[in-house]
Amino acid sequence: MALKDTAKKMKDLLDSIQHDLAKAEKGNKAAAQRVRTDSIKLEKVAKLYRKESIKAEKSGLLKRKPSTKAPAKVKKTAEKKAPKKSSAAAAKTSKAVKASKPASKKTAAKKVKKPSKARGFRK
């Protein structure tokens, strides 16, 4: 299969999955099954697409267009200066204030187990 055919097949599968997903959300069980099977097909086609695209790139079939953006400018790194003593002293005092406050305890919410709606096994 050619790369274009594989891409078209992937698009068709994606459209099909999206269409069936809308139906499955409304409760259509057949559509949910189609979504599951189509997603498996899509996975296989995606693997094939990856293989074909790598092969095409190596052989030169896929040519990348040169970017229209200008190359990024290199920024000069500024030298780091030592922090001022006043800010260091302020940081120490803020730590002391935080340490003096008592830690408030939050009560964890208990999880309530809901009874299951499943029926028991029939004998």
UniProtKB/Swiss-Prot annotation:
Output one GO MF annotation. DNA binding
Q: Which InterPro entries match?
A: Hc1
> So what does this one do?
Might have a role analogous to that of eukaryotic histone proteins.
Q: Where is the composition biased (Basic residues)?
A: 61-75, 103-123
Spans of biased composition, class Low complexity?
A: 85-102
Q: What is this protein called?
A: Histone H1-like protein HC1
Q: Does the keyword DNA-binding apply?
A: yes
Q: Where is this region: Disordered?
A: 54-123
Q: What UniProt keywords are attached to this protein's entry?
A: DNA-binding, Repeat
Asked if Secreted is a keyword of the record, the answer is no
- Which family is it part of? Belongs to the histone H1/H5 family. HCT subfamily.
Membrane-crossing ranges are: none
Annotated source species: Chlamydia pneumoniae (Chlamydophila pneumoniae)
